[in-house]
Curated annotation (Swiss-Prot):
Catalyzes the transfer of an acyl group from acyl-phosphate (acyl-PO(4)) to glycerol-3-phosphate (G3P) to form lysophosphatidic acid (LPA). This enzyme utilizes acyl-phosphate as fatty acyl donor, but not acyl-CoA or acyl-ACP. This is Glycerol-3-phosphate acyltransferase. GO terms for biological process: phospholipid biosynthetic process. Pathway: Lipid metabolism; phospholipid metabolism. PANTHER family: GLYCEROL-3-PHOSPHATE ACYLTRANSFERASE-RELATED, INNER MEMBRANE PROTEIN YGIH. The gene is plsY. It is a multi-pass membrane protein. It catalyses: an acyl phosphate + sn-glycerol 3-phosphate = a 1-acyl-sn-glycero-3-phosphate + phosphate. Belongs to the PlsY family. The keyword Cell inner membrane applies. GO terms for cellular component: plasma membrane. It is an enzyme of class 2 (transferase).
Amino acid sequence: MNFPIFALFSFVSGSIPFGYWIALRFAGVDIRKLGSKNIGATNVGRLIGWKFGFIVLALDITKGMLPVYLSSVYVPEGGIPFQLLCGVCAVLGHMFSPFLGFRGGKGVATTFGVFLVLTPIACLGAVLVFWVVYKFFKFVSLGSIFASITLPLVYAFSTILLLHEEVSYWVLGTMVFISFGIILTHRENIIRILNRSELFAVKGEEQDGDSERNRR
């Protein structure tokens, strides 16, 4: 399989809107018109149940992992640069899905899948950042933004200090590029956070969050 065909496969793989299809199939709802109007796992879990939310999360992560892994197996001559290109194609497919009129999701889970194959330690660090931010603020979107911002930093420090290896500027540059894209896809979330109208991941947390804000 040549480079263009595999890159196209990566884009199509990433563009499969699992969240939209699962919500439509099992709950009969258009996820793009409810809640945060996002097709990702958080909105699916919030609206139709976290059993489905976690399924969507796993599938969206797999959309990022599969093209990167398969490109290393079937197009090994492409090396890390081509694996990264396939990863970027998968993330762009998720963000601009042709199945949804070239609209899509935020790209966080798919990005996690891409770098879980290439830099698992950095991904674990980013997950830790996400969890800390989420536990404190109760916003998945804010945790995702901070995780995407810190991912390149965690990669650089973990590579140098833990693995004692040289930083790949291909990997680092791609991380920065995708992280910037993720921040752009969260621009509406950022506005809602500033306006204090952002939705919590779990409905029951809304009252607790409002009470906490009133005490500040």
